[in-house]
Amino acid sequence: MRKFPSLLAQRLNFGEGPLAGRIKTATNPDGVIADNSMIKMIDASLREGALYRFRDPATGLGDEGKMVKLLNNFWSAVETVFTDDWDKKPRYSRLLHGVGILALGSLMDEIDQVHQDYKGEPGWTEIPSYTRFVEELNRIKPLCAWSGGVWNFGTDIDGQPIVRKWNELQNLSKDISLVTDFLVMNYIKAVNADINT
């Protein structure tokens, strides 16, 4: 199963999309994104996220063209919305760090799920467009602190604020979960607020 996510990561790295030349591999040592983070993000999406519906369960492979298009639309939108962080190395910004890649991958899956609820509406497309992803990412942009300031993650069970400086976030599952849950929860909150107005 691991081979296919790796193949998709290569397609992104050596294609013409926003991630071209950005994923660090043995053959592309100048990339800024750890290939392991990108492969993990793709693997999670294939298992139960936006890429799942393009899979062929019999082979574990799937419609590469549609998968690459969805990933390119999303990461192009990330580049637009977080343009100040896009060219920074992970030590200067957590956007293209393992934390950012994996948290945003989960958000991509959530945005896609919301998008599927609009099936049948005028102008609906099977794959969310770049513009759609930009609109949806802008909902959570003000909450992000990829390269400066602090993240305000709410409060813990004792009512104490959970505040983390941007550069305190490490590529650890607890930090990745913290950012992922925060972004997904606030995205859903924003979507629901729209529906109810």
Give the positions of each predicted feature.
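Accessory terminal alpha-helical modules
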Residues: M1-T197
